[in-house]
């Protein structure tokens, strides 16, 4: 169990370091990649997921996402006694990963005066605030993610091919469905860094938009549960 928890911790740390790292590079001022756009962000997140799964996959199932962990447990693939430890490890990894992003980009955070840009490097936020629409966006994106992960398990791939497929899937979801909310798809990916946003001493950071914070937590869990329901028909 300890190896599995370390794998979930380390994989989620790398996921956030690389994923929110690319967001910081695009959004924060005076970086070499400043203003390179949404396509760069989606590509970066796809690579982040693939690298994180490669690194952690020999230690744990590489869920790196509480919604995936809950979905696997609902499907009968993980004992419920393991769910909370997995999720705690994922949150710990996400929070430490975000600290490393902050350390990497510290001078650029200090040069940023826009609170919204700072928050965007920590957590997701909607392009247009609409509770129902935003929730549906997170449900749909996570439904596609988890259903496809389950479906990939039906095929025999050479080692590593499935991981590349998941990375490509993240890019696809981001390009197709992610532009409305920033596509969290993962409670740890959003809430863990959002907590760190409240803690870290960053000038001009503003608040953490906590009125929105429940959507990237609840939406992915609902999406994962729906994916389990649909996959049961396969």
UniProtKB/Swiss-Prot annotation:
Known catalytic reactions: glycerol(in) = glycerol(out)
The UniProt record lists the keyword Transport: yes
Topology term for the membrane: Multi-pass membrane protein
Tagged with keyword Protein biosynthesis: no
Residue window of motif NPA 2: 186-188
Chief location of this protein within or outside the cell: membrane
UniProt entry keywords in alphabetical sequence: Cell membrane, Membrane, Repeat, Transmembrane, Transmembrane helix, Transport
Entries under InterPro entries matching the protein: Aquaporin-like, MIP, MIP/Aquaporin, MIP_CS
A Pfam family: MIP
Renumbered ranges of motif NPA 1: 65-67
GO cellular component: plasma membrane
GO molecular function: glycerol channel activity
Subcellular location: Cell membrane
Transmembrane segments: 9-29, 37-57, 61-81, 83-103, 135-155, 159-179, 214-234
Domain notes: Aquaporins contain two tandem repeats each containing three membrane-spanning domains and a pore-forming loop with the signature motif Asn-Pro-Ala (NPA).
Annotated function: Mediates glycerol diffusion across the cytoplasmic membrane via a pore-type mechanism.
Family assignment from sequence similarity: Belongs to the MIP/aquaporin (TC 1.A.8) family.
Protein name, UniProt field: Glycerol uptake facilitator protein
Source species: Streptococcus pneumoniae (strain ATCC BAA-255 / R6)
């Amino acid at each position: 169990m300890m190896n599995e928890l370390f794998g979930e911790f380390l994989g989620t740390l790398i996921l956030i370091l690389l994923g929110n790292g690319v967001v910081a590079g695009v959004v924060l001022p005076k970086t070499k990649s400043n203003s390179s756009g949404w396509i760069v962000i989606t590509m970066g997140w796809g690579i982040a997921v693939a690298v994180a799964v490669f690194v952690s996959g020999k230690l744990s199932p590489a869920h790196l996402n509480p919604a995936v962990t809950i979905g696997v447990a609902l499907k009968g693939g993980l004992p419920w006694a393991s769910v909370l430890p997995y999720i705690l490890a994922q949150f710990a990894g996400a929070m430490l990963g975000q600290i490393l992003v902050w350390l990497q980009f510290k001078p650029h955070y200090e040069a940023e005066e826009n609170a919204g840009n700072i928050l965007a490097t920590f957590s997701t936020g909607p392009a247009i605030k609409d509770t129902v629409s935003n929730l549906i966006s997170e449900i749909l994106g996570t439904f596609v993610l988890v259903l496809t992960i389950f479906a990939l398990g039906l095929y025999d791939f050479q080692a590593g091919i499935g991981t590349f497929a998941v990375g490509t899937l993240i890019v696809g979801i981001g390009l197709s469905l992610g532009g409305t909310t920033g596509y969290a798809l993962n409670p740890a990916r959003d809430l863990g860094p959002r907590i760190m946003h409240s803690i870290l001493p960053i000038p001009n950071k503003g608040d953490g938009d906590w009125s929105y914070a429940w959507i990237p937590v609840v939406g992915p869990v609902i999406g994962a549960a729906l994916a389990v329901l649909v996959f049961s028909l396969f």
